[in-house]
Design a protein with these regions (language model features):
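Glycine-rich His-Gly loop
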Residues: 89-92, 226-227, 263, 377
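Active-site signature of alpha/beta-hydrolase-fold catalytic machinery across serine-
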Residues: 234-240
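Gly/Ala-rich beta-loop-alpha elbow adjacent to hydrolase catalytic centers
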Residues: 225-229, 233
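Helical cap/lid subdomain of alpha/beta-hydrolase-fold lipid enzymes
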Residues: 2-20, 25-57, 63, 248-519
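Active-site catalytic pocket residues across diverse enzymes, especially alpha/beta-hydrolases
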Residues: 183, 240-244
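Alpha/beta-hydrolase fold nucleophile elbow
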Residues: 212-226, 255
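Flexible, membrane-associating and regulatory peripheral segments of lipid-active enzymes
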Residues: 1-214, 495, 499-519
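Short coil/turn segments at beta-strand junctions that form active-site/ligand-binding loops
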Residues: 83-84, 218-220, 368-370
Length: 519
C-alpha cells in the first residue's frame, strides 16, 4: 500500500512538472502572436489603409481553407544546388517550422477576437469589410508555437538550413516517411503494408514543392538529429538504401553526414519510468504518466480545434481521430484502446524502449560513404562508487527527478534481459531523458564501427563509415528551446557541427559556401 501511495505521489509530481513546463512554452508562443496581432492592428488604426487588390481583400472560405490546410504542406523555402543543406530534425514532443499565412478572419481565436473587441470599444466601430480589406497589414505568419525555435535559433547560423515539422509523437517509421517527402516533395506515402497493419490512411499531407527537390546522390544532405530525431534519420537512410520510395531511384549516398545530438540510438530506461512495461517494451502500465499523456493526446486530436492544432500538432492526422470523422463513439473506442495509434503501437514510445531500439537497429546499417558524429550528454557523476546527479541547479527542473531515478535503474529480476551482456551499471549515467550509453553509437544488438573523441581535432580528417562520439556535460534539453541556458556552450557546439558539415564532411572537395572562401 505504501509503495502504491508513493507511486501516485511520484506520478502527481511528474505530471505537474511536465504540465507547467508545457504551459510555459505554449503561453510564450501565444504571447508572441498576441504581440504580433496587437502591432498589426495598431498600424491599421493609426493610418488609413491603402486600397488592396480584390484577391487580397476577399473573404476566406474558412471551411475550405481548413480542409486544404489539412491536406497540404506549408509553402516551402526551396533550396537547390551547392552547398548541401543542413537539415535539423527535432525529437519527441518537438516541432519545426510549420508556417501558414492566415488573415484576421481565419485567426478567429479567443485572443484575437478579444483584442479586436477591445480596440472597437476604445476607438469606435470599424466596418468588418474595411478590417478584412487591410489583410496585408494584419496578416502574420502563424507558426508552430508562435515561431518558437526548437533548436533555439541555431538554424540562423547558416544560410542553408531546413527545420522540418514532423509528427511529435508519431512512430520513427512514420516520421522518416514524412521527412523524405518534406525534402523531395509529393504526397506522404506511409507504405501500404505498414498502413494496413497499423490501421491508418496510407497517404498524408501534400508537399506540392519539396524543400530540396534536387535531392539525390549528386546533391546529398547533412542531417543533425536531436534525441529521437537521430534515429528517424537512420531509418530514413535505410529506406533510401532499400529504395523504399516508389517512383524514386534512391540510394544510401543521398545522405552525406549524420550528426546525432543526444540521440536515442539504443533506447532508454526512462520509458519504463514513464510507464512502458519492461517485460515487452510495447504495453503501458494501467496507471502512469504515459496514460495521462495518451488521454490528453486523444482528446486534443478528437476536439480538432484548427487554431490550436496550428500551434501544435502531435502528428496523428493520418489516423483521422477528429470528432468530425469518428464522433463521440469513436472517442470512446480511442480512450478504451480499441483503435488509434496507441492501440496499434504505432507511436514513438515503443520505439524508444531498449527492446524497440534493438528491433530497429537489427535492420539498420552504418554506410561506408556517410560521415557520422555523435554527442552523448550526461548529467551524472560517481560519488563513493555510486552514480548521482552531477549538480542540482544545473539540471532542468523537468528532468531532475528522472536523472535521479535513472541513476538507480535496476532491471526487474522477473523480466528477461533485453540483450546478451546487459549490465545495470552500464545504463546509470544519463541526461534525464536518455542513458549516456545509448547516445554514443549504435551498439545493440551489434556494435557499429566507432571511435571515441576527446577533442574535435582528434578526428580530422574524418573518415566515413565510422561513428565518432564525444561525451559532454549537459542535460537532455540544454541545447534546444532556450539558448540562454547553455550560454557560450551553445555557440561552441553548433558552430562545431556546422563547421564540420561545411569543411570536413565531403566526398570530392569542400563545398563553396556563399560569401565564404573554401579553406
Amino acid at each position: 500500500m505504501a509503495r502504491f501511495i508513493l507511486s501516485l505521489m511520484e506520478l502527481g509530481v511528474s505530471a505537474a512538472v511536465h504540465l507547467v513546463f508545457g504551459f510555459y512554452v505554449f503561453s510564450t508562443a501565444v504571447a508572441a502572436d498576441i504581440s504580433q496581432a496587437a502591432a498589426a492592428s495598431g498600424c491599421l488604426l493609426l493610418r488609413r489603409p491603402p486600397p488592396a487588390p480584390a484577391t487580397e481583400g476577399a473573404l476566406v472560405d474558412v471551411a475550405a481553407a481548413g480542409e486544404r490546410d489539412e491536406r497540404r504542406g506549408d509553402a516551402p523555402v526551396v533550396l537547390d544546388g551547392s552547398p548541401p543543406p543542413i537539415v535539423l530534425v527535432h525529437g519527441i514532443f518537438g516541432f519545426g517550422k510549420g508556417v501558414r499565412h492566415q488573415t484576421e478572419r481565419e485567426l478567429s481565436s479567443f485572443f484575437f477576437s478579444a483584442l479586436s473587441g477591445a480596440m472597437r470599444w476604445v476607438f469606435g466601430e470599424m466596418p468588418r469589410r474595411q478590417l478584412c480589406s487591410c489583410s496585408p497589414l494584419i496578416r502574420f505568419r502563424a507558426q508552430r508555437l508562435g515561431g518558437l525555435s526548437y533548436f533555439a535559433g541555431a538554424e540562423k547560423k547558416d544560410d542553408r538550413v531546413l527545420v522540418p515539422d514532423l509528427g511529435s509523437l508519431t512512430s520513427i517509421h512514420d516520421r522518416a516517411r514524412e521527412l523524405f517527402y518534406y525534402l523531395k516533395g509529393g504526397q506522404v506515402d506511409y507504405g501500404e503494408d505498414h498502413s494496413k497493419a497499423c490501421g491508418h490512411k496510407r497517404f498524408g499531407r501534400i508537399y506540392e514543392t519539396g524543400h530540396y527537390p534536387v535531392w539525390d546522390e549528386q546533391n546529398p544532405v547533412h542531417f543533425v538529429g536531436h534525441s529521437a530525431g537521430a534515429q528517424v534519420v537512420r531509418v530514413l537512410h535505410q529506406m533510401l538504401a532499400d529504395k523504399a520510395f516508389p517512383g524514386h531511384d534512391t540510394s544510401e549516398d543521398w545522405i552525406l553526414s549524420l550528426t546525432s545530438l543526444s540521440g536515442a540510438l539504443n533506447g532508454t530506461t526512462r520509458t519504463y519510468y514513464d510507464g512502458m512495461l519492461v517485460e515487452d517494451g510495447k504495453s503501458m502500465k494501467s496507471i502512469c504518466l504515459l496514460q495521462l499523456c495518451r488521454i490528453g493526446v486523444i482528446v486534443y486530436d478528437w476536439l480538432d480545434i484548427p487554431w490550436l492544432k496550428n500551434y501544435y500538432n502531435f502528428g496523428f492526422d493520418h489516423y483521422e481521430m477528429s470528432r468530425r470523422k469518428v464522433g463521440f463513439s469513436g472517442l470512446i473506442d480511442l480512450l478504451l484502446g480499441y483503435t488509434g495509434p496507441f492501440a496499434s503501437g504505432d507511436w514513438i514510445l515503443p520505439d524508444l524502449t531498449i527492446q524497440g531500439a534493438i528491433k530497429l537497429n537489427s535492420t539498420l546499417k552504418t554506410f561506408p560513404n556517410t560521415f557520422y558524429f555523435s554527442y552523448a550528454t550526461k548529467k551524472t557523476r560517481k560519488l563513493f562508487g555510486i552514480t548521482v546527479p552531477s549538480s542540482v541547479l544545473g539540471v532542468h527542473p523537468m528532468l531532475f527527478l528522472r536523472v535521479l531515478q535513472m541513476c538507480m535503474w535496476r532491471h526487474p529480476q522477473n523480466a528477461p534481459l533485453p540483450y546478451k551482456g546487459y549490465r545495470d551499471e552500464d545504463w546509470e549515467d544519463n541526461d534525464g531523458a536518455l542513458n549516456t550509453i545509448s547516445m554514443t553509437y549504435p551498439r545493440i544488438p551489434i556494435e557499429h564501427p566507432h571511435r571515441f573523441v576527446v577533442d574535435d581535432s582528434d578526428c580530422h580528417p574524418l573518415q566515413p563509415g565510422i561513428w565518432y562520439y564525444k561525451i559532454i556535460e549537459a542535460d537532455h534539453i540544454l541545447f534546444i528551446v532556450n539558448r540562454e541556458r547553455a550560454g557560450v556552450q551553445f555557440d561552441l557546439l553548433y558552430d562545431g557541427i556546422f563547421q564540420r558539415c561545411r569543411k570536413h564532411a565531403f566526398r570530392k572537395s569542400p563545398p563553396t559556401v556563399p560569401n565564404e572562401t573554401s579553406q
